Amino acid sequence: MGCFFSKRRKPAQGGQQQGASQEPAAGEEKAPQYSWDQRAKVDPKDYTFSGLKDETVGRLPGRVAGQQFVIQDCENCSIYIFDHSATVTIDDCVNCQIFLGPIKGSVFFRNCKDCKCIVACQQFRTRDCRRLEVFLCCATQPIIESSTGMKFGCFQYYYPELALQFKDAGLSIFNNTWSNIHDFTPVSGENNWGLLPENAVVQDYVPLPASEELKAVRVSTDAMKSIIPITRGQRQKNSDESCLAVFFAGDYTTANARKLIDEMTGKGFQLVQTKEVSMKAEDAQRVFQQCASEFIPLLERGPVVALEFNGDGAVEGCRNTVNDVFNGTKVFVSESKASASQDVDNFYNFADMQMGM
């Protein structure tokens, strides 16, 4: 294979060779400038916490800005990443309290033990971990491997920049499979994971940051303020009556869904699960059945947001609330207790297949 050579430039008049830093003479072309030449240099140290002990450290909003982050060999530390990132790896950490803002890709815990965490991500995985307690928002099914004593709860957190960080990370606040754990290495007769108590207090696990710098982030762990709706997930339902409500894409879809959640939970009903997903006409036929023709034209606007509520009288309560609060807005709501369970199954079976593609 040959080599490419360029001719050596002749010395300028007067015997001086032209320096590389001089401007090109008239008529000569400038060397092309590429975007990657002008990109700011990334210092890995700015995106790494390594070898720390008994420290409180973190990154403020805007300081990570979608980069990869590494946490390793930390002991008895409180770590707060108040920003979105691409991926996060956490290796060989012991007795740490960790908050991780929205992660566009995966978070991977390896060989960690006795850590308490709050995490939002696209993919969650652990390997060779023991006794992790995690308040989780995960868009796909979380996976544990060779890990024991794992406990999970629903992500519950707020600070003013968090909603935009979820958007920047490409995560929907309605897609959270926090309790649907897949154990890659199950042991016969044992259960390597379980759920945190339903009344678990987030700050008892991951306290608010104590350092003056990190206190500037206005954090709340109040369930009513949480960016992620608090769902029951796979906890046992209190009633055999559920109801499906589906909002269609529009300017106020998220706000309307949050409003219905507030109204229904305020009346004592429980939010079991939520989902945001795109639908086609044939999907609507299967899910909405005889009502499909009414909703198919709305599917072109974008993804739908579905909510499952549970509790005695959930269908009547949801229909009355939608009529009172969202009059004039097209919303699918189960028609009766008899049809509601099938509505829920039809939608979430479709959604699980769609998300798995």
UniProtKB/Swiss-Prot annotation:
Signal peptide: none annotated. GTP binds at G105, S106, Q122, Q123, F124, R125. One of its GO terms (biological process) is post-Golgi vesicle-mediated transport. It is found in: Cell membrane. Residues 32-186 form the C-CAP/cofactor C-like domain. SMART domains: CARP (SM00673). It holds the Pfam family TBCC. The keyword Lyase does not apply. Myristoylated on Gly-2; which may be required for membrane targeting. Palmitoylated on Cys-3; which may be required for plasma membrane targeting. InterPro entries: C-CAP_CF_C-like, CAP/MinC_C, CAP_C_sf, CARP_motif, NDK-like_dom_sf, Tubulin-bd_cofactor_C_dom, XRP2. GO terms for molecular function: GTP binding; GTPase activator activity. The keyword Mitochondrion does not apply. Residues 1-39 are annotated as: Disordered. One of its GO terms (cellular component) is cilium. Keywords: Cell membrane, GTP-binding, GTPase activation, Lipoprotein, Membrane, Myristate, Nucleotide-binding, Palmitate. Belongs to the TBCC family. This is Protein XRP2. It comes from Gallus gallus (Chicken). The lineage of its organism: Eukaryota, Metazoa, Chordata, Craniata, Vertebrata. The gene is RP2.
